[in-house]
Amino acid sequence: MSSVNQIYDLFPNKHNIQFTDSHSQEHDTSSSLAKNDTDGTISIPGSIDTGILKSIIEEQGWNDAELYRSSIQNQRFFLTDKYTKKKHLTMEDMLSPEEEQIYQEPIQDFQTYNKRVQREYELRERMEEFFRQNTKNDLHILNEDSLNQQYSPLGPADYVLPLDRYSRMKHIASNFFRKKLGIPRKLKRRSHYNPNAEGHTKGNSSILSSTTDVIDNASYRNIAIDENVDITHKEHAIDEINEQGASGSESVVEGGSLLHDIEKVFNRSRATRKYHIQRKLKVRHIQMLSIGACFSVGLFLTSGKAFSIAGPFGTLLGFGLTGSIILATMLSFTELSTLIPVSSGFSGLASRFVEDAFGFALGWTYWISCMLALPAQVSSSTFYLSYYNNVNISKGVTAGFITLFSAFSIVVNLLDVSIMGEIVYVAGISKVIIAILMVFTMIILNAGHGNDIHEGVGFRYWDSSKSVRNLTYGLYRPTFDLADAGEGSKKGISGPKGRFLATASVMLISTFAFSGVEMTFLASGEAINPRKTIPSATKRTFSIVLISYVFLIFSVGINIYSGDPRLLSYFPGISEKRYEAIIKGTGMDWRLRTNCRGGIDYRQISVGTGYSSPWVVALQNFGLCTFASAFNAILIFFTATAGISSLFSCSRTLYAMSVQRKAPPVFEICSKRGVPYVSVIFSSLFSVIAYIAVDQTAIENFDVLANVSSASTSIIWMGLNLSFLRFYYALKQRKDIISRNDSSYPYKSPFQPYLAIYGLVGCSLFVIFMGYPNFIHHFWSTKAFFSAYGGLMFFFISYTAYKVLGTSKIQRLDQLDMDSGRREMDRTDWTEHSQYLGTYRERAKKLVTWLI
């Protein structure tokens, strides 16, 4: 040990003690460890008694090296204290009562401390060598099957191992299929282990342990994807593990078992995969991927519900409050996904930091949400077509447009992810530019300028003193009236209670408009340098979305009357009354120009038409009929391109679930360019749901499915906050890894943990009160109830099923896996662009680049 620099030992980095490979002593140590006395004591040079080491191992219950390392990782002089205590133990001490005795060398000066560090290093080095030597000699660790085989009174031939819950369910299902198919039952033993083996070696024990103790089983897929590794070799190792696990299950039954055949097929399918997703997305790609999903039907169509129930200021306030809650959620989870940017997405991180069943339910709930969002985007594109009365929109034409819009999203998602990113970027930047232009357009029209010179509108529709007849202006609607059909909203709940309910309703409505901002986390597995990309993309995305929403809502809110019956109603049961009000012109006398006319198809009022968009209504108010028609066509483009983001999130969620062994492994299959085409194709099959828009009688049922999609998003946001809080408190207990205050910490979100608590409480309220109007007298609707709480029901069913059939449990904070994925990213070097002040032109260019 004299060759080791003693000063270097004072700054350890492995389990608090620096370990170095002693190649010069490897042969001597191995040969020394091979000597065995009759009493089991081994004499080793360096005055270390391995008999004492063995007694420490037995006392601590260290069956393998992993348990040993986990026990000593947070204690600097653990072995020194234990060894000294054992060595100084006398007969008198053994006969005395059990009291904790501490035998330590007092730390008096620098040299004493250095000696203790060196002594601890020697003990740990010997212990490591001891474990390695016993592994080479096949130290057998008997499993439950082997113990009962040797020591059961019934003997090894008659004993049948009891089944756990998972095995019982599989056994029942196996017997059912066996009876149906006429397969003879030849059961040897009920065991998941190989009955031909007496026990398992240390290596096999580690393999089995890693698949049960680690929550996120996808250790391979949790690595940094761009890390320079031999993919073929690593996949060979994974397949070898799968084959070993399969061999254990195949030994259960001599005859055929359908369930075991299915498991064998799944294991073989994993062996065929050669490629995985690749990091090709830049900041601007990820940014526009989320923006493209947000700037769609949620803002430009369903915002009409908010205006009709809460008025202009209530709508603005509700959108702002919802934005603050979601901002807290995004900033919190950004910190977690930046430190550990794994390809399993937020489902995998939720499994790791909350519970396996929680991550399972969260992942499948989000997949259901995205799966329903795709046909919702496609069908809403066809709904806008009803605006054009001179176009014959037959069922065949509608089906053709649905096919066209669906095929567009599918083809784009099957392209190389970098090409898809460029397409999404062009579409997203176009949406941002159009949104900015519409803000200026609304302000110019409000000031009295436009096609024809007209009087300025100002804040006329915000001033309750300017109300006339049945036109009730004001910051809020006069009352919280769910049954208002253009009569002025005078029969509902008035006062502060009514305004509170109106604002709360807008907050629930706006969750659909903000759905999609979480897509930056799904793309973390395909982001170039995620520790820089994800925080930047998240902050830019939400800044653009929130600021754009506020200005868009404000600018259109000053140009429309919130009581116009052409806007979508919050309660769908009054669609017929609103249609009659439109025919009579009730609530439409506020318009400055009435030259924009057209037929209205009553059958489509319940789901919204081109007339229902507040921006189209505002343009018609100023007599800009051609402009209104053109913008309605732009809205078709907005919703059609949003389908790309919906299918992307749907396919990547399915891929992540497969990576975690929570979905069939076939969904892991990727093309050579890193596209999970099996997940894309399977997810796209559900776009056929959009064809129910062809049949007008089924539109109401489709509206229920769309509401399930939007309501489920709040559950996802709630899960993101909960995952971060568990991570936050677990990180505070791990003193041996990076701290949040460290300068090298990738991203530190502000005001924690209060920010995450605020987001968790807000999102939980969204989930609980999503369907509260159903409990108001005379407004119960079974379909509306299930559309509001259907996602929550699915989440609890998934969670309970996985909890019952699996082995999921909530881990203690000190047992959470804080290393998988993080350490690989720590070892990855990214090439960063040099940053400098530059000229004014370069600064301006940099500002524009940061925004878009």
UniProtKB/Swiss-Prot annotation:
Gene3D superfamilies: Amino acid/polyamine transporter I
Membrane topology label: Multi-pass membrane protein
Keyword Cytoplasm: no
GO biological process, one term: amino acid transmembrane transport
Residue ranges crossing the lipid bilayer per the database entry: 286-306, 330-350, 358-378, 401-421, 423-443, 501-521, 541-561, 624-644, 674-694, 704-724, 756-776, 785-805
Stretches of the chain found on the membrane's Extracellular side: 307-329, 379-400, 444-500, 562-623, 695-703, 777-784
Keyword annotations: Cell membrane, Membrane, Transmembrane, Transmembrane helix
MF GO annotations: amino acid transmembrane transporter activity
This protein's GO CC annotations: endoplasmic reticulum; membrane; plasma membrane
Top-level taxon of the source organism: Eukaryota
Compartment(s) of residence: Cell membrane
UniProt-listed Pfam families: AA_permease
Signal peptide positions (record): none
Region (Disordered): 21-41
Self-association and partners: Component of the plasma membrane SPS (SSY1-PTR3-SSY5) amino acid sensor complex. Interacts directly with PTR3 and SSY5. Interacts with YCK1.
PANTHER family cross-referenced by the UniProt entry: AMINO ACID PERMEASE, SPS-SENSOR COMPONENT SSY1
Functional summary from the UniProt entry: Amino acid sensor component of the SPS-sensor system, which regulates the expression of several amino acid-metabolizing enzymes and amino acid- and peptide-permeases in response to extracellular amino acid levels by controlling the activity of two transcription factors, STP1 and STP2. Amino-acid permease homolog that seems to interact directly with the extracellular signaling molecules, but has no amino acid transporter activity. May recruit casein kinases YCK1 and YCK2 to hyperphosphorylate and activate downstream component PTR3 in response to amino acid stimulus.
Family: Belongs to the amino acid-polyamine-organocation (APC) superfamily.
Protein's name according to its UniProt entry: SPS-sensor component SSY1
Source organism of this protein record: Saccharomyces cerevisiae (strain ATCC 204508 / S288c) (Baker's yeast)
